[in-house]
Amino acid sequence: MSSEDPPGKLHRHHLAPSDSSQAILDAALRVLRPHIPTSIPLYRRLQFGRFFPDSFLFTNLDLGAPSLPIDAHASNGTGAGSRPNSHYRHEDPWLIAFVDRTCRPETEVWVFGSWEDSPPASSPSPSPSSPTETQEEWQAIDNLVAELVRACRNLPVPRSLHQDILDAQQTQQQAADTDPAPSTNPPPNPFAAARVPTIQLWGAIHSTTATILERLDVLASTSQVTSTAANHTFMFDVPSLPPPSALPDGLEWGEVKREHFALIRSKSEIPRWDRTMASLPSLAIYPAAGNCGSGGGPPVAWAFIGLDTSVTTLHVEPEWRGRGLGKTVTTKLFKQGMQRFWEDGVQRLAHGYVVLGNKASEGMMRSLGGRDMWKCYWLRVDLEKAGNM
């Protein structure tokens, strides 16, 4: 393969800690770096680490390290070497994806495609204003995303990191289903789909790629783009953020404590499990010790840095709102919790997601200087549909 050859078929790289996987990570980050900020969700996810034996990186680029070529009809490929290749024609689409089914029911896939940063000029739909060449570009992009979905379908499904919780939920659900006279209607379980191994959660999916998944008809019936709330993606230049404001009297800083994980999960529309929260940098605001005997109580505001380093699970208790605590905790978390992700010569950016319609959070992000860059989605892909493509 010469330096002028286009990207080839998808290859699968293991990300379990090793010298070879570090070389792959370094190469992937080099490819993604010029595409920041659009590539930042995947870029930061790879920086964060927290890889398991079933953590994989998929790409059709030659990253210069041994990899497994993907056979669309088999779950295991044969080993193959590859040679460095860092020059790709603009019209040849490429993607890099992080996939780990161990993390279900939480996000299993982050992906960046070259078309997200530089899409073909015209619509993929045939029309007099859409030249054949552009339609062929979109078809190549669709084919590449379809190949990724098929590759995900053919992965083994490991035991979930949260299997004990999923099993307990299933037992509770079975008991409720057999109760002849339930006294109350149990709340819907947002992670019920996680017990179905063919349903896979893709996160922070750029609106352009979300449209491709919809066009391929691989989204679960309950996770269509048209019926799923999109998210604003806000970007922050951390060095330009003002210093965090001083806390009001009677409050003090701390980290989120494990004993408060259940409270935090109950306040979020996207619950995160204890093992994940324990691995994330966090910041919380507590009643000060000795403050009218309330010291040691639960936090009144909190936020985490997520696996893709976005500010996540940001919450201020209702009785404490209107005092700027959300802005204060976000600013302090960005300035102190992101230190290990900074690199020489790379702009120090942080980001956060706000669901469309949440005007309060959107206003807070804008007041901090956040730039609304693009829309993204969390979507469930039905891997059984991959056979129909």
Segment roles from a protein language model:
Residues 33-68, 73, 262-292:
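Active-site rim helix/loop that mediates acceptor-substrate recognition in acyltransferases
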Residues 44-248, 378-381:
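Acyl-donor-binding surface of acyltransferase catalytic domains
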Residues 201-207, 347-362, 371, 380-387:
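Conserved beta-strand-loop-alpha-helix junction that forms the acyl-donor binding cleft
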Residues 271-319:
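A conserved beta-strand-loop-helix scaffold within acyl/acetyltransferase catalytic domains
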Residues 321, 330-338:
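A conserved short alpha-helix in the GNAT/GCN5 acetyltransferase fold that borders
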